[in-house]
Amino acid sequence: MDLPDSASRVFCGRILSMVNTDDVNAIILAQKNMLDRFEKTNEMLLNFNNLSSARLQQMSERFLHHTRTLVEMKRDLDSIFRRIRTLKGKLARQHPEAFSHIPEASFLEEEDEDPIPPSTTTTIATSEQSTGSCDTSPDTVSPSLSPGFEDLSHVQPGSPAINGRSQTDDEEMTGE
């Protein structure tokens, strides 16, 4: 029985003698250096992630603000072109001889309005709405008046202003 015990001791002794302690210490030192590098890299990535998250928040707010501004500008331009078409239609009715060379079909076409929702909750929905087509041609006449549009069809074009106020100013004061 003494033989197997000595054989196992011999085997373990030879395995231990094969391992160089300097190599093991060098491997442990290399692993510690790599661990330090990985910890520094991880810290830098966390800082970068925090910074980029803050910048994303700032840019998202700016993008949303600019998108709302663009939607508001589109709405204003639609209103302006609608007013121009309305005025052009009124002028065409008042002075048909000046508009005789324009085909009647262009006056009768109605514009396809894309309704813009009052709230822009998401930037995706807002940007999709702002890319919708907008018919800005002044040849099309829209029969409806936009809210807040002042009807000047009853005022004579050459009517003078009295005391710095036109007739429409007086009507606004009495209408309010």
UniProtKB/Swiss-Prot annotation:
Keywords: Acetylation, Lysosome, Membrane
Start-end of Low complexity biased regions: 119-128
Sequence ranges of Polar residues compositional bias: 129-145
UniProt region (Disordered), positions on chain: 95-176
Modified residues (N-acetylmethionine): 1
Principal subcellular localization: membrane
Keyword Acetylation: yes
Keyword rRNA-binding: no
GO cellular component: BORC complex; cytoplasmic side of lysosomal membrane
Biological processes annotated in GO: lysosome localization; organelle transport along microtubule; regulation of endosome size; regulation of lysosome size; vesicle-mediated transport
Membership in a protein family: Belongs to the KXD1 family.
Function, in words: As part of the BORC complex may play a role in lysosomes movement and localization at the cell periphery. Associated with the cytosolic face of lysosomes, the BORC complex may recruit ARL8B and couple lysosomes to microtubule plus-end-directed kinesin motor. May be involved in the biogenesis of lysosome-related organelles such as melanosomes.
Quaternary structure and partners: Component of the BLOC-one-related complex (BORC) which is composed of BLOC1S1, BLOC1S2, BORCS5, BORCS6, BORCS7, BORCS8, KXD1 and SNAPIN. Associates with the BLOC-1 complex. Interacts with BLOC1S1. Interacts with DTNBP1/BLOC1S7 (via coiled-coil domain).
The name this protein goes by in its record: KxDL motif-containing protein 1
Annotated organism of origin: Homo sapiens
